[in-house]
Amino acid sequence: MIKLRLKRFGKKREASYRIVAINNLARRDGRPLEELGFYNPRTDEVRLDVPGIVKRLQQGAQPTDTVRRILVKANVFEQVSATAAS
């Protein structure tokens, strides 16, 4: 199963995260199938590849709870349902 989850990078105590599509059995920082965005919790900065995320969600990828919250804030699920309806 493919998951959309956070991959940690950055210095100690200054973590940032990449939002990646990855096999659910892979390690947290393992090689992703695709990098779909960036999240910095210290500054609340978020950059998303929305078309790529929509494509992965339509293929059946499951977001983790944290990634789901980020996507809800960015209204990505509305775009998924709009794409599915048309």
Swiss-Prot record:
Covalent S-S links between cysteines: none
PROSITE patterns noted in UniProt: RIBOSOMAL_S16
One Gene Ontology term from the biological process aspect of the record: translation
A GO term for molecular function: structural constituent of ribosome
Keyword terms: Ribonucleoprotein, Ribosomal protein
Pfam family, one: Ribosomal_S16
Keyword Ribosomal protein: yes
Cellular component terms per the entry's GO annotation: cytoplasm; small ribosomal subunit
PANTHER family: 30S RIBOSOMAL PROTEIN S16, SMALL RIBOSOMAL SUBUNIT PROTEIN BS16M
Family to which this protein belongs: Belongs to the bacterial ribosomal protein bS16 family.
Protein name per Swiss-Prot or TrEMBL: Small ribosomal subunit protein bS16
Lineage: Bacteria, Bacillati, Cyanobacteriota, Cyanophyceae, Nostocales
Gene label: rpsP
